[in-house]
Amino acid sequence: MIAVLVDTTNDAHLLHKVYEGVENLTLLVNPTNNEVDRVLRERPGETLMCMGHGFSGGLIAESYYTGHGPAVAVGDRNIELLKDRKLICIWCNADGFATRHTELEGFFTSMFISNEMEAALFGFDAYEDDIFNEVTLFAERVNRLIKENTDLSEWPAILRGQAAMEKDYVRFNYDGLQYKGKKLKKNVRNPEPAGMNK
């Protein structure tokens, strides 16, 4: 498994618990898009996990915050190298990235409240300590699913069953979890000539 963590904020830092103790892991912390590209080419077909802040265009790179280099660590530019592998995409609006690229397969978060500012922006009354605790619990739950080799298609339902859904922002986060399978192009068969059906 390849793990990419863009660890530039306190809430993103909590996501290191997702891969803690996972065996046979290639870890890239704050990589450039080129570094991600190189590792994807070296390890075709290997599951890729991406974590941090993002949008429907991809996982935001450290360079977005510094103003030096491309703003995206994983995004449209990598799409050909993302198609033939399973993905675990944990960033805000990762599901939008998958919607734009229907050939992708994996587990995707939607908007995911991970700090007090995001909670306020979406009208939730929640404190940073509680939010950080919930992010940590989410990371630990995902870690367990990885170690148990649970099929990605089962993740959303399992995670919802473990969450404190009575908290409005937690329910918002977990309701947005999705598994997306590949959308295969329909193979339109030529109709058989008359009289060939027996």
Where do the PLM segments sit?
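A short, glycine/acidic-enriched catalytic loop
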Residues: 55-83
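Short, low-complexity, polar/charged sequence segments that are solvent-exposed and flexible
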Residues: 22-24, 45-48, 67-69, 106-110, ...
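Short, surface-exposed basic-aromatic patches at helix termini and helix-loop junctions that form
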Residues: 20-21, 41-45, 78-82, 98-109
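A domain-level signal for caspase-like cysteine endopeptidase catalytic cores
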Residues: 1-51, 86-90
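Short acidic, S/G/P-rich loop/turn micro-motifs used as interaction or catalytic elements
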Residues: 9-14, 32-35, 53-62, 93-97, ...
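Active-site-proximal C-terminal subdomain of hydrolase catalytic domains
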Residues: 86-198
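A diffuse structural propensity rather than consistent per-protein peaks
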Residues: 32, 72-75, 151
